[in-house]
Design a protein with these regions (language model features):
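Terminal targeting signals and extreme-terminal segments of soluble enzymes
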Residues: 2-170
Length: 170
């Protein structure tokens, strides 16, 4: 049951993000299982210049070109951006098995600063895909192929009916 608050939020989001309705409509499950389609959505990833560049069986490569807004006050790539890059890389790798996932738990290790680099590249890889959860790792490299960070993510495989219209209305 929708409340007045839900309706108010819907109006605010629709005005602030006119393409959000297109993104939120999950009539075609294939869109969400095709990792390259992420590049088409005007959402968080595109706002942060994150692009999926390669997808394999349980693997992914995701890149971000650094811009001024990507940097922290010390002139290095912001840790939150590096974490987000890992989250996207692991999510894309986990989805190559044809299942919808969300991040359940995460652990990141920042190994060196990401300074004086034009882009960061994250490589995601599924370590284990279980019945309801999976373990996926990511490594982030600068443009000279130096290892910047590593991350381990536990993903939850979402029931395919979660995003149907009838489930969304409950």
């Amino acid at each position: 049951m929708r409340t007045w608050y839900d309706n108010a939020l819907n109006v605010i989001w629709t005005e602030a993000y006119p393409n959000m309705e297109q993104t939120m409509q999950m009539e075609n499950k294939a869109v969400y299982l095709d990792p390259f389609r992420y590049n088409e959505f005007e959402g968080f990833n595109s706002h942060n210049h994150i692009v999926v560049t390669e997808v394999g069986d349980g693997t992914s490569v995701v890149e971000v070109k650094l811009v001024q807004e990507s940097l922290n006050p010390l002139g290095m790539a912001h840790g939150g951006l590096i974490f987000t890059l890992c989250d996207v890389a692991t999510g894309v790798a986990a989805r190559t098995g044809g299942r919808i996932t969300v991040t359940l738990d995460s652990n990141i290790h920042f190994l060196r600063r990401a300074k004086d680099t034009e882009k960061l590249v994250a490589r995601g890889r599924v370590v284990k895909a279980g019945r309801t959860t999976g373990l996926v790792t990511a490594e982030v490299f600068d443009d000279t192929d130096k290892l910047i960070a590593t991350a381990d993510m536990t993903v939850y495989y979402v029931d395919e009916n979660t995003y149907t219209d009838s489930a969304a209305q409950k």
